[in-house]
């Protein structure tokens, strides 16, 4: 065992071989490096697989031995200051190592085919491998200095990956937005680290926690300073994990390739903030105000993320807001003292969300030959539908991921989310009510996404649902064809620009590109042509893209059972509790308390009922766009009653506008901060150009004219220049003599 731990420090550097080899190859032998293009994917997967095997061995030893290992190298700068660099292996580290490596391998295998035709193939795999290196270094860090170094590297990699297609202005703006937003959190983190060192005199975690706890218990430090510096540390996690109010970068980060989105949302950037909170939880637990702040930010984030996802039409942005909401659950858990539930949901959500993002990539990959390669069309759920017959495997995997995120048993997220809900009732009934309500919203928007994507018919082949076959526009009413005139068709499925006012009852249409329309056939084609891989219809992805989906399905089905307490309090079968024993004991938690299965079953029935209600509402509104609502007497009678519609319409429009416009938070930031800062920058630029540059330019111009004047007086002869020079020197000496004599006379008297 000791020998395995002794080599744990090498883990972050194994994937680093890929970007270094690609860089040297392109520098020294570019032709040979590009000729073995696809081999770099195999190289990346192989090296990360070695790390995964190493991590699995460490995790097994953690479960069996409950052992915390720390290896340090001391770098002494002088007698008063020494910096220790090292590697820390504990339950949290081993969990993160398994997540990063397993999800990373699946994403790399998937990316080999997904990015095969991209000109930036080598740059993509170099950036992905360097991102894995940065995250592995972050989770194995033994002190705050190492944390900050790898923290910045993770941010840099995310910046490069989000802006991978930097020639697109939207992608360039998205990576800048992510970079600037995270600068706020990173600056807070740096100040917090320096503040903690000022208080404790140590960067190393174990020493820092002990010194800090002693100072708190002995009232050896001002509580206001402690709270302030701890808040700055938490600010870094808020920005990195897209928590309110620094969440605005997350949906725009979807401008990168879909495998990047899967990696960022499941195992790297957004998880880094959660990891930081978990790592510093022994410090936060002795500061009640910080724990209250963490739980408050978590509950606000989970609710806002769910409401913002309700009306999004971009499949990746819907999943992005889903990630924001689920990260709110994970952030809520440590805030209410539920370290185990936070770790549990971190695991289950990672695999479910990776499955959903890679599934969405398969969908987008199949839609691009039909609607074009613009994300506004290939990622638009309004143009999808009916993909079940074309993407049967993707459909099954996406459905399982959706059910897991909805909290339907026995899938993974059910067990972890229910544990958070149970603990939230003990902490605050208000927080518990919000969390349970958000469970219903999650089920609604996730099934809305699934139904719009896979059910009914392929809507891109409809020129207009109302029957105007010659029109180049199309709109769909969720109330059915016959009710479209009653409710001014276009409802939820209308599409608009971001700067337009959105209404649930607006009559809007979506224009299909004329080049794409020339490729289309009538929708009434025979099934013989449907099964062919033609540009007119989507087709299932290749095996290299489907294999990661199937593997992630296995994780989604079974990974939840590692945290189920089958044992009635005996820790032989509760794998997660055994895994977390050292950390939870350090946080003074007792895992031997009896597990109340009756209470768990009661709460589970309640939460599953809420989720099923959300699924039912989504099925009611989106499940039968074309036919079912025509024959649904309840819905037809509902829409025919004008008084009810008058009452319902303003409420729905307010909710829809709030969701579609992201709560107007982005608009507020753009108005107050972006325009304000740009205005200030223009003002300072104008001052610099006109005043500062004016002064320096004025001296230059004055010198020029003086020189020209002297040249004119001298006439271009050297003798004249010498005469003028001697004259000026003589005048200067005479003036100096008289001034010196006057000064001496004044001093004498």
Curated annotation (Swiss-Prot):
Subcellular location: Plastid, Chloroplast thylakoid membrane
GO MF annotation terms: NADH dehydrogenase (ubiquinone) activity; quinone binding
A single cellular component GO annotation: chloroplast thylakoid membrane
Residue stretches spanning the membrane: 9-29, 40-60, 89-109, 147-167, 185-205, 219-239, 258-278, 280-300, 327-347, 354-374, 396-416, 425-445, 544-564, 605-625, 694-714, 722-742
Domain of life of the source: Eukaryota
Catalytic activity entry: a plastoquinone + NADH + (n+1) H(+)(in) = a plastoquinol + NAD(+) + n H(+)(out); a plastoquinone + NADPH + (n+1) H(+)(in) = a plastoquinol + NADP(+) + n H(+)(out)
EC number from the UniProt entry: 7.1.1.-
EC class: translocase
Family recorded in the similarity comment: Belongs to the complex I subunit 5 family.
Function: NDH shuttles electrons from NAD(P)H:plastoquinone, via FMN and iron-sulfur (Fe-S) centers, to quinones in the photosynthetic chain and possibly in a chloroplast respiratory chain. The immediate electron acceptor for the enzyme in this species is believed to be plastoquinone. Couples the redox reaction to proton translocation, and thus conserves the redox energy in a proton gradient.
Protein name as it appears in the record: NAD(P)H-quinone oxidoreductase subunit 5, chloroplastic
UniProt source species: Illicium oligandrum
